[in-house]
Protein backbone atom coordinates (compact mmCIF):
# COMPACT_ATOMS: atom_id res chain seq x y z
CA UNK A 1 0.00 0.00 0.00
CA UNK A 2 2.70 2.44 -1.05
CA UNK A 3 1.35 4.23 -4.09
CA UNK A 4 2.38 4.00 -7.72
CA UNK A 5 5.55 6.13 -7.57
CA UNK A 6 6.89 4.35 -4.48
CA UNK A 7 6.10 0.95 -6.00
CA UNK A 8 8.04 1.85 -9.15
CA UNK A 9 11.10 3.02 -7.21
CA UNK A 10 11.03 -0.01 -4.92
CA UNK A 11 10.68 -2.36 -7.90
CA UNK A 12 13.85 -0.87 -9.35
CA UNK A 13 15.80 -1.51 -6.14
CA UNK A 14 14.51 -4.88 -4.89
CA UNK A 15 15.14 -8.18 -6.66
CA UNK A 16 12.84 -11.17 -6.76
CA UNK A 17 9.43 -9.48 -6.98
CA UNK A 18 7.50 -10.66 -10.02
CA UNK A 19 4.59 -8.23 -9.65
CA UNK A 20 3.25 -5.48 -7.42
CA UNK A 21 -0.53 -5.07 -7.37
CA UNK A 22 -0.50 -1.68 -5.72
CA UNK A 23 -2.88 0.62 -3.94
CA UNK A 24 -2.96 3.88 -1.94
CA UNK A 25 -2.80 6.29 -4.89
CA UNK A 26 -5.89 4.65 -6.41
CA UNK A 27 -4.67 5.00 -10.00
CA UNK A 28 -6.57 3.00 -12.59
CA UNK A 29 -3.69 1.84 -14.80
CA UNK A 30 -4.89 0.23 -18.07
CA UNK A 31 -1.39 -1.08 -18.81
CA UNK A 32 1.30 -2.17 -16.34
CA UNK A 33 4.64 -0.45 -15.85
CA UNK A 34 7.58 -2.80 -16.39
CA UNK A 35 10.52 -1.94 -14.13
CA UNK A 36 14.01 -3.34 -14.65
CA UNK A 37 16.25 -4.20 -11.70
CA UNK A 38 19.41 -6.20 -11.00
CA UNK A 39 17.43 -9.43 -10.79
CA UNK A 40 15.25 -9.01 -13.85
CA UNK A 41 11.93 -7.22 -14.28
CA UNK A 42 8.95 -6.40 -12.04
CA UNK A 43 5.38 -5.69 -13.18
CA UNK A 44 3.76 -2.73 -11.36
CA UNK A 45 -0.01 -2.24 -11.56
CA UNK A 46 -2.81 -0.30 -9.86
CA UNK A 47 -6.54 -0.94 -10.20
CA UNK A 48 -8.15 2.23 -8.89
CA UNK A 49 -10.47 2.28 -5.87
CA UNK A 50 -14.04 1.70 -4.73
CA UNK A 51 -14.49 -1.43 -6.82
CA UNK A 52 -14.44 0.51 -10.09
CA UNK A 53 -12.04 -1.92 -11.75
CA UNK A 54 -10.76 -5.44 -11.32
CA UNK A 55 -7.09 -5.89 -12.14
CA UNK A 56 -6.57 -9.30 -13.75
CA UNK A 57 -3.00 -10.58 -13.98
CA UNK A 58 -2.32 -14.01 -15.54
CA UNK A 59 1.14 -15.57 -15.41
CA UNK A 60 2.69 -18.16 -17.71
CA UNK A 61 5.21 -19.89 -15.42
CA UNK A 62 7.94 -22.16 -16.77
CA UNK A 63 10.80 -23.73 -14.81
CA UNK A 64 9.83 -21.77 -11.72
CA UNK A 65 9.98 -18.40 -13.44
CA UNK A 66 7.48 -16.06 -15.10
CA UNK A 67 7.87 -16.61 -18.84
CA UNK A 68 5.02 -14.33 -19.93
CA UNK A 69 2.03 -12.50 -18.51
CA UNK A 70 -1.25 -10.92 -19.53
CA UNK A 71 -2.78 -7.98 -17.67
CA UNK A 72 -6.23 -6.48 -18.06
CA UNK A 73 -8.10 -3.74 -16.23
CA UNK A 74 -11.74 -4.78 -16.22
CA UNK A 75 -14.44 -2.20 -15.43
CA UNK A 76 -16.97 -3.46 -12.89
CA UNK A 77 -20.51 -2.82 -14.11
CA UNK A 78 -22.12 -3.22 -10.70
CA UNK A 79 -25.66 -2.54 -11.93
CA UNK A 80 -25.43 -5.28 -14.56
CA UNK A 81 -23.54 -8.07 -12.84
CA UNK A 82 -25.66 -10.27 -10.55
CA UNK A 83 -24.72 -9.97 -6.89
CA UNK A 84 -23.50 -12.95 -4.89
CA UNK A 85 -26.66 -13.98 -3.04
CA UNK A 86 -24.96 -14.89 0.24
CA UNK A 87 -22.90 -11.72 0.36
CA UNK A 88 -25.87 -9.54 -0.64
CA UNK A 89 -27.92 -11.04 2.20
CA UNK A 90 -25.14 -10.35 4.70
CA UNK A 91 -24.83 -6.73 3.54
CA UNK A 92 -28.60 -6.20 3.79
CA UNK A 93 -28.57 -7.61 7.33
CA UNK A 94 -25.74 -5.35 8.46
CA UNK A 95 -27.20 -2.26 6.77
CA UNK A 96 -30.78 -2.79 7.94
CA UNK A 97 -30.56 -0.80 11.22
CA UNK A 98 -29.03 2.17 9.38
CA UNK A 99 -30.81 2.01 6.02
CA UNK A 100 -33.25 4.85 6.69
CA UNK A 101 -30.52 7.18 7.98
CA UNK A 102 -28.15 6.42 5.12
CA UNK A 103 -30.84 6.88 2.50
CA UNK A 104 -32.10 10.25 3.75
CA UNK A 105 -31.88 12.86 1.00
CA UNK A 106 -30.05 16.00 2.14
CA UNK A 107 -29.98 17.90 -1.16
CA UNK A 108 -29.68 17.42 -4.92
CA UNK A 109 -26.79 18.25 -7.21
CA UNK A 110 -27.16 20.02 -10.55
CA UNK A 111 -23.66 19.04 -11.62
CA UNK A 112 -21.04 16.35 -11.19
CA UNK A 113 -19.57 15.99 -7.71
CA UNK A 114 -16.20 14.23 -7.77
CA UNK A 115 -13.17 14.02 -5.51
CA UNK A 116 -10.09 12.93 -7.42
CA UNK A 117 -7.89 15.77 -8.62
CA UNK A 118 -4.35 16.80 -7.75
CA UNK A 119 -5.52 20.08 -6.22
CA UNK A 120 -9.29 19.93 -5.73
CA UNK A 121 -12.57 18.42 -6.85
CA UNK A 122 -16.17 19.62 -6.82
CA UNK A 123 -17.02 17.20 -4.01
CA UNK A 124 -14.26 18.63 -1.83
CA UNK A 125 -15.28 22.17 -2.83
CA UNK A 126 -18.72 21.39 -1.40
CA UNK A 127 -17.09 20.52 1.94
CA UNK A 128 -15.00 23.70 1.85
CA UNK A 129 -18.00 25.90 1.09
CA UNK A 130 -19.97 24.32 3.93
CA UNK A 131 -17.16 24.79 6.45
CA UNK A 132 -16.59 28.43 5.52
CA UNK A 133 -20.31 29.22 5.73
CA UNK A 134 -21.21 27.31 8.89
CA UNK A 135 -18.04 28.11 10.83
CA UNK A 136 -17.81 31.70 9.58
CA UNK A 137 -14.23 31.30 8.35
CA UNK A 138 -12.79 33.05 5.28
CA UNK A 139 -10.35 30.16 4.66
CA UNK A 140 -10.90 26.41 4.81
CA UNK A 141 -8.69 23.35 4.39
CA UNK A 142 -9.90 19.86 3.45
CA UNK A 143 -7.62 16.79 3.24
CA UNK A 144 -6.49 15.57 -0.17
CA UNK A 145 -8.14 12.19 0.21
CA UNK A 146 -8.23 10.16 -3.00
CA UNK A 147 -11.06 7.76 -2.18
CA UNK A 148 -14.74 8.43 -2.70
CA UNK A 149 -17.53 8.04 -5.22
CA UNK A 150 -18.95 10.55 -7.69
CA UNK A 151 -22.47 11.89 -8.18
CA UNK A 152 -23.86 12.93 -11.56
CA UNK A 153 -26.07 15.91 -12.31
CA UNK A 154 -29.62 15.36 -11.07
CA UNK A 155 -28.72 12.80 -8.43
CA UNK A 156 -29.70 13.07 -4.79
CA UNK A 157 -27.07 13.84 -2.17
CA UNK A 158 -27.80 11.33 0.57
CA UNK A 159 -26.35 11.00 4.03
CA UNK A 160 -24.59 7.87 2.77
CA UNK A 161 -22.72 9.88 0.11
CA UNK A 162 -21.72 12.47 2.71
CA UNK A 163 -20.41 9.71 4.97
CA UNK A 164 -18.66 8.15 1.98
CA UNK A 165 -16.78 11.43 1.53
CA UNK A 166 -15.93 12.06 5.17
CA UNK A 167 -16.05 8.93 7.35
CA UNK A 168 -12.72 8.35 9.08
CA UNK A 169 -11.82 7.71 12.71
CA UNK A 170 -10.59 11.31 13.05
CA UNK A 171 -13.16 13.39 11.13
CA UNK A 172 -13.41 16.18 13.70
CA UNK A 173 -14.11 19.70 12.44
CA UNK A 174 -11.74 22.41 13.61
CA UNK A 175 -11.46 26.20 13.61
CA UNK A 176 -7.95 27.55 14.11
CA UNK A 177 -6.26 30.94 14.17
CA UNK A 178 -3.27 30.72 11.83
CA UNK A 179 -0.73 33.33 10.81
CA UNK A 180 0.01 33.85 7.16
CA UNK A 181 3.41 32.24 7.75
CA UNK A 182 1.76 29.15 9.28
CA UNK A 183 -0.64 28.85 6.36
CA UNK A 184 2.32 28.90 3.96
CA UNK A 185 4.09 26.25 6.04
CA UNK A 186 1.03 23.99 5.90
CA UNK A 187 0.76 24.33 2.12
CA UNK A 188 4.51 23.82 1.65
CA UNK A 189 4.53 20.69 3.83
CA UNK A 190 1.68 19.07 1.94
CA UNK A 191 3.15 20.19 -1.38
CA UNK A 192 6.46 18.51 -0.56
CA UNK A 193 4.57 15.37 0.44
CA UNK A 194 3.04 15.31 -3.04
CA UNK A 195 5.79 16.70 -5.28
CA UNK A 196 9.06 15.66 -3.64
CA UNK A 197 11.22 14.25 -6.47
CA UNK A 198 12.10 11.23 -4.31
CA UNK A 199 9.04 8.94 -4.22
CA UNK A 200 10.09 7.61 -0.81
CA UNK A 201 9.25 11.04 0.63
CA UNK A 202 5.81 11.08 -0.98
CA UNK A 203 3.49 9.94 1.78
CA UNK A 204 0.28 9.67 -0.25
CA UNK A 205 -2.73 11.89 -0.73
CA UNK A 206 -3.37 14.76 -3.09
CA UNK A 207 -2.78 18.44 -2.31
CA UNK A 208 -4.78 19.85 0.58
CA UNK A 209 -7.96 21.42 -0.78
CA UNK A 210 -8.18 25.14 -0.08
CA UNK A 211 -11.28 27.32 0.12
CA UNK A 212 -11.30 31.12 0.02
CA UNK A 213 -7.56 31.47 -0.50
CA UNK A 214 -5.86 31.90 -3.87
CA UNK A 215 -2.20 31.01 -4.34
CA UNK A 216 0.46 30.09 -6.88
CA UNK A 217 2.19 26.70 -6.91
CA UNK A 218 5.35 25.57 -8.68
CA UNK A 219 5.51 21.76 -8.27
CA UNK A 220 9.02 21.69 -9.75
CA UNK A 221 10.54 23.99 -7.12
CA UNK A 222 12.39 22.79 -4.03
CA UNK A 223 11.01 22.25 -0.54
CA UNK A 224 9.72 25.47 0.98
CA UNK A 225 9.76 27.28 -2.37
CA UNK A 226 6.66 25.93 -4.13
CA UNK A 227 3.96 28.21 -2.69
CA UNK A 228 3.74 31.96 -3.38
CA UNK A 229 1.35 34.86 -3.99
CA UNK A 230 -1.18 33.78 -1.33
CA UNK A 231 -4.17 36.10 -1.45
CA UNK A 232 -7.46 36.47 0.42
CA UNK A 233 -10.05 38.63 -1.34
CA UNK A 234 -7.29 39.87 -3.63
CA UNK A 235 -5.02 40.99 -0.78
CA UNK A 236 -1.68 39.36 -0.08
CA UNK A 237 -1.56 37.42 3.17
CA UNK A 238 0.60 39.02 5.85
CA UNK A 239 3.11 36.69 7.49
CA UNK A 240 2.38 37.86 11.06
CA UNK A 241 -1.37 38.45 10.73
CA UNK A 242 -3.76 35.81 12.09
CA UNK A 243 -6.54 34.36 9.94
CA UNK A 244 -9.50 32.18 10.90
CA UNK A 245 -9.18 28.79 9.19
CA UNK A 246 -11.77 25.98 9.20
CA UNK A 247 -10.67 22.41 8.63
CA UNK A 248 -11.24 18.80 9.51
CA UNK A 249 -9.42 15.47 10.06
CA UNK A 250 -6.75 16.71 12.49
CA UNK A 251 -3.91 14.33 13.35
CA UNK A 252 -2.85 16.05 16.59
CA UNK A 253 -4.18 14.24 19.66
CA UNK A 254 -5.20 17.48 21.40
CA UNK A 255 -7.33 18.42 18.40
CA UNK A 256 -8.94 14.98 18.38
CA UNK A 257 -9.83 15.30 22.06
CA UNK A 258 -11.19 18.85 21.91
CA UNK A 259 -14.84 17.75 21.78
CA UNK A 260 -15.45 19.18 18.31
CA UNK A 261 -18.27 18.10 16.03
CA UNK A 262 -17.70 15.59 13.27
CA UNK A 263 -17.41 17.16 9.82
CA UNK A 264 -20.66 15.59 8.63
CA UNK A 265 -22.46 17.35 11.49
CA UNK A 266 -21.24 20.64 9.98
CA UNK A 267 -22.02 19.83 6.35
CA UNK A 268 -25.40 18.09 6.73
CA UNK A 269 -27.47 21.11 7.92
CA UNK A 270 -25.78 23.27 5.29
CA UNK A 271 -26.81 20.83 2.56
CA UNK A 272 -30.39 20.76 3.83
CA UNK A 273 -30.46 24.55 3.77
CA UNK A 274 -29.01 24.73 0.24
CA UNK A 275 -31.45 22.12 -1.13
CA UNK A 276 -29.85 22.26 -4.61
CA UNK A 277 -26.08 22.31 -5.16
CA UNK A 278 -24.81 23.98 -8.32
CA UNK A 279 -21.13 22.98 -8.53
CA UNK A 280 -18.94 25.65 -10.05
CA UNK A 281 -15.24 25.62 -10.79
CA UNK A 282 -13.29 24.20 -7.89
CA UNK A 283 -10.84 26.61 -6.26
CA UNK A 284 -7.38 25.64 -7.49
CA UNK A 285 -3.98 27.34 -7.44
CA UNK A 286 -2.35 28.98 -10.41
CA UNK A 287 0.30 26.52 -11.58
CA UNK A 288 3.66 27.50 -13.06
CA UNK A 289 6.41 25.45 -14.74
CA UNK A 290 4.17 22.42 -15.27
CA UNK A 291 3.96 22.21 -19.07
CA UNK A 292 4.13 19.88 -20.90
CA UNK A 293 3.25 17.60 -17.95
CA UNK A 294 -0.55 17.77 -18.08
CA UNK A 295 -0.77 15.24 -15.26
CA UNK A 296 0.18 17.83 -12.66
CA UNK A 297 -2.95 19.88 -13.38
Feature-to-residue mapping (PLM):
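Conserved beta-sheet core of the metallophosphoesterase superfamily
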Residues: 4-58, 206
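Catalytic centers of hydrolytic enzymes
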Residues: 36, 47-297
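Short, internal active-site loops enriched in acidic
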Residues: 1-5, 146-147
Amino acid sequence: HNGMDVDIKMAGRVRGIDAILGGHTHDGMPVPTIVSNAGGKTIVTNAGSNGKFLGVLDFDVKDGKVAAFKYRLLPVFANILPADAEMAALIRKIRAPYEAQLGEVLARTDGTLYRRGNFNGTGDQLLLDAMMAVQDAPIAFSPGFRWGTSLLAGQDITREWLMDMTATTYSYATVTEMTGATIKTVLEDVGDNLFNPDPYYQQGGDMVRVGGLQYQCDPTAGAGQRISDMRLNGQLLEADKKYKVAGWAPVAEEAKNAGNKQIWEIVEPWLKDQKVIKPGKANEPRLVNVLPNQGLA
